[in-house]
């Protein structure tokens, strides 16, 4: 059973004007599809390790060395993007009271969290991701990862993530990454974030 490219949970133009349809089409149909194809090609070389990417990336030492980086790059790329699509919504959603209180306790206020997340996304040199995670101690934490590395590799559970590779925003925002980050906060699917938060804390 090969890894499958998931459908977008909304139309390509559903997130406009924040993310344009052309960007969504290229991002999903080309970039994400390539990660899926390359992850499958790598895993086919070692069928004995299976296809559970979350389990494999939680302990990359178990991935045979000849495909390890390919699985990190492409398996991570698939997991990150499959989550990313679900973390956005054209519908207005609300953060849960429990998560809101945890954010306030951890960062001081929602605005302080937003500033920390924005700093992580803006400060990531080159390509990568910004994340809100639940760490091994059950605490919220903001961090960024390079390339397609996933917080799962650090034993952390991502509940919100933003792709800051240029392919995610360049058509619409050119080199002004902060405007893209600001737009992202307008389309966050808090229903999904709340769900991931509850699962991570369980």
Swiss-Prot record:
It catalyses: 2 superoxide + 2 H(+) = H2O2 + O2. Binds 1 Mn(2+) or Fe(3+) ion per subunit. Keywords: Iron, Manganese, Metal-binding, Oxidoreductase. Changing residue 104 to D: In strain: ATCC 13813. Mn(2+) binds at residues 27, 81, 163, 167. Pfam families: Sod_Fe_C (PF02777), Sod_Fe_N (PF00081). GO terms for molecular function: metal ion binding; superoxide dismutase activity. Fe(3+) binds at residues 27, 81, 163, 167. GO terms for cellular component: cytoplasm. InterPro entries: Mn/Fe_SOD, Mn/Fe_SOD_BS, Mn/Fe_SOD_C, Mn/Fe_SOD_N, Mn/Fe_SOD_N_sf, SOD_C_sf. It is an enzyme of class 1 (oxidoreductase). Its cofactor is Mn(2+); Fe(3+). Its EC number is 1.15.1.1. Belongs to the iron/manganese superoxide dismutase family. Destroys superoxide anion radicals which are normally produced within the cells and which are toxic to biological systems. Catalyzes the dismutation of superoxide anion radicals into O2 and H2O2 by successive reduction and oxidation of the transition metal ion at the active site. This is Superoxide dismutase [Mn/Fe]. The gene is sodA.
């Amino acid at each position: 059973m090969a890894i499958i490219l998931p459908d977008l949970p909304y139309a390509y133009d559903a997130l406009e004007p924040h993310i344009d349809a052309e960007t969504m089409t290229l991002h999903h149909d080309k970039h994400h599809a390539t990660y899926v194809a390359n992850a499958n090609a790598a895993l086919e070389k070692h069928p004995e390790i299976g296809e559970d990417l979350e389990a494999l990336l939680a302990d990359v030492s178990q991935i045979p060395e000849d495909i390890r980086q390919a699985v990190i790059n492409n398996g991570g790329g698939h997991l990150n993007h499959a989550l990313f699509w679900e973390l956005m919504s054209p519908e207005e959603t609300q953060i849960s009271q429990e998560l809101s209180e945890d954010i306030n306790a951890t960062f001081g206020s929602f605005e302080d969290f937003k500033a920390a997340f924005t700093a992580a996304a803006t400060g990531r040199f080159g390509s990568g991701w910004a994340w809100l995670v639940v760490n091994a101690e059950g605490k919220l934490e903001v961090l960024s990862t390079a390339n397609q590395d996933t917080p799962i590799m650090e034993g952390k559970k991502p509940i919100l993530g933003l792709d800051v590779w240029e392919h995610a925003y360049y058509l619409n925002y050119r080199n002004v990454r902060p405007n893209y980050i600001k737009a992202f906060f307008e389309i966050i699917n808090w229903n999904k974030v709340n769900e991931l938060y509850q699962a991570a804390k369980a």
